[in-house]
């Protein structure tokens, strides 16, 4: 088995999908989890206005709507959390995503004060954060807020990780990578677009250039610039297609060096890092 085949198998990626079937699969997955653990009353998700959180948010609200109708349990809710750092550059996109999802509840937590306070406390301890590490601080502060909300609403935190993100480890460890349940896991980027199109999402929300937008020195830095490959390259690779050798090498290097991000904390029983 080639490394490409191993990666595809590990991430559960498929070369082709039926959008309606995958929508149903994710919604039923969320519903099944909530029904298995009836003490869970809410799904909590940060909404940025980008493709992934828009899709995950819509699936969450669909699952909650169906469960309330089927069980009569009106205590179930989906909580969409706005988590800007100061003023969000693409604020209108976020508002459009909220309008599309129609969440039961929308909360806004501006993380800038918390991030700056943490940075100042570290500075007083003799640690000066780089812009890159400050970006990770933002991602972790966002997740911290979501877990606080989940803790106070008997909820679980929903993630937006998918195969095209997981393969490169393009997420912050214990930031946006630290969630309870990931309904998009297995899909690549273009497949996520297919689901949103099937759900009649406004096109500009999934045709915009993806960006983590964490760095102050490089605001709205496109993911594809940071990664050195395009999402079309990554999707082709995940679909088992032949890609240029340098592209495959870049993707595989990302995968191998970020393996620790896709695993629980390393123990004496792990040996993947020795290979």
Curated annotation (Swiss-Prot):
Mg(2+) binds at residues 52, 165. Deamido-NAD(+) binds at residues 33, 136, 140, 173, 180, 260-261. It holds the Pfam family NAD_synthase. GO terms for cellular component: cytosol. One of its GO terms (biological process) is NAD biosynthetic process via the salvage pathway. ATP binds at residues 46-53, 82, 88, 160, 189, 211. The keyword RNA-binding does not apply. It is an enzyme of class 6 (ligase). The keyword Magnesium applies. Keywords: ATP-binding, Ligase, Magnesium, Metal-binding, NAD, Nucleotide-binding, Phosphoprotein. One of its GO terms (molecular function) is protein homodimerization activity. InterPro entries: NAD/GMP_synthase (IPR022310), NAD_synthase (IPR003694), NH(3)-dep_NAD(+)_synth (IPR022926), Rossmann-like_a/b/a_fold (IPR014729). Pathway: Cofactor biosynthesis; NAD(+) biosynthesis; NAD(+) from deamido-NAD(+) (ammonia route): step 1/1. It catalyses: deamido-NAD(+) + NH4(+) + ATP = AMP + diphosphate + NAD(+) + H(+). Homodimer. Catalyzes the ATP-dependent amidation of deamido-NAD to form NAD. Uses ammonia as a nitrogen source. Belongs to the NAD synthetase family. This is NH(3)-dependent NAD(+) synthetase.
């Amino acid at each position: 088995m080639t490394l490409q085949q191993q990666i595809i198998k590990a991430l559960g990626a498929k070369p082709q999908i039926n959008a309606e079937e995958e929508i149903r699969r994710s919604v039923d997955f969320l519903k099944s989890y909530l029904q298995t653990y009836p003490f869970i009353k809410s799904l909590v998700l940060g909404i940025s206005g980008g493709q992934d959180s828009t899709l995950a948010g819509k699936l969450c609200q669909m699952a909650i709507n169906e469960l309330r109708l089927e069980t009569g349990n009106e205590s179930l809710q989906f909580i969409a959390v706005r988590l800007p750092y100061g003023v969000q550059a693409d604020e209108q996109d976020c508002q459009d995503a909220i309008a599309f999802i129609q969440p039961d509840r929308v909360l806004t937590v501006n993380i800038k004060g918390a991030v700056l306070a943490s940075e100042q406390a570290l500075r007083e301890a003799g640690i000066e954060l780089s812009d890159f590490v400050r970006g990770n601080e933002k991602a972790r502060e966002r997740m911290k807020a979501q877990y606080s909300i989940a803790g106070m609403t008997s909820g679980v935190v929903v993630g937006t990780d998918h195969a095209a993100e997981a393969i490169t480890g393009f997420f912050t460890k214990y930031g946006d990578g630290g969630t309870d349940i990931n309904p998009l896991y297995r899909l690549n980027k273009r497949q996520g677009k297919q689901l949103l199109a099937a759900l009649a999402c406004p096109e500009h929300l999934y045709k915009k250039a993806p960006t983590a937008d964490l760095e102050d020195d490089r605001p709205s830095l496109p993911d594809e610039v940071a990664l050195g490959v395009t999402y079309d390259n990554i999707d082709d690779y995940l679909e088992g297609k032949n890609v240029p050798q340098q592209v495959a090498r870049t993707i595989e290097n990302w995968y191998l060096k970020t393996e620790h991000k896709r695993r629980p904390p390393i123990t004496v029983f792990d040996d993947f890092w020795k290979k």
